[in-house]
A protein has these predicted regions:
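Outer-membrane beta-barrel translocator/pore domains, especially the C-terminal barrels
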Residues: 1-235
Length: 235
């Protein structure tokens, strides 16, 4: 039995082009949307024709463009504020995906208000792959009812061989112009064992600008289980 709609106003339910057409787009299986709404969207997809020899070398979809929005006959104040689904005209959400070759790919997701003059959500990520070297960047900006996060992040990894790799992650908070953290990990992995050395540095936690550092070791043996050491850097 499905209950009548609950008050979900305070729930965090940002919509995008993937979720806006879902029957469970409000993210609560115990309730349904009340009232009437119309969801419309458009999609453009450019694909590459490839032969069997190229099947694993190049991405099939080169360019993706998507736009969608929701119209409602009456305002529904019980809908999540971050989703804008309770308004007569919701935000316009969109996606642009670009994969011209097997070295580079990029995705851009955004939300514009219904007047198309306020960019509420702005997320851009790009990935570069050259042999065993992979680096990716992500930029996120939230405004208005969606949130207030704003950061840029990088994740980089390099595989020395089939078993050994090193990875690095760093994030900078653009709102306060401070680096949040950086992580460094060296990992060895085979069929039955994974061993890693991890270094983590947080530059601030919950408003405290005092940096914290951690260095620890982890070991996983199949099927015996996993072990992780305590922080070996004195506080």
């Amino acid at each position: 039995m499905v209950a009548i709609q609950q008050n979900l106003k305070s729930e965090d339910r940002r919509i995008d082009v993937n979720s806006i057409f879902s029957l469970d787009r409000i993210g609560n299986s115990s309730t349904v949307e009340s009232g009437q709404s119309l969801t419309i969207g458009t999609e453009y997809l450019k694909s590459r024709k490839i032969n069997n020899e190229e099947e694993n070398e190049y991405p099939t979809d080169v360019l993706e463009l998507s736009l969608a929005t929701v119209f409602r006959d009456e305002i529904n104040e019980s809908m999540p504020t971050t989703s804008s689904l309770g308004s007569k005209s919701s935000d316009v959400v969109g996606h642009i995906g670009l994969s011209p070759n097997n070295f580079f790919s990029s995705n851009y997701n955004f939300s514009l208000d219904n007047n198309l003059d306020v960019l509420k959500y702005n997320s851009l990520d790009a990935k570069f792959t050259v042999n065993n070297f992979i680096t990716s960047f992500k930029y996120l900006e939230e405004n208005d009812n969606i949130g207030d996060e704003n950061y840029i992040e990088n994740n980089t990894s390099f595989k020395f061989n089939e078993n050994s790799s090193i990875g690095f992650s760093v994030r900078k908070n653009k709102k306060i112009d401070l680096t949040e953290f950086y992580d460094l990990i060296y990992q060895y992995k085979n069929d039955c064992l994974t061993a890693a050395i991890k270094y983590k540095k947080d530059f601030y936690v919950d408003g405290d600008l005092k940096p914290t550092e951690q260095l620890f070791f982890s070991l996983t043996i199949v099927p015996l289980g996993a072990f992780e050491s305590a922080n070996v850097i004195p506080k």
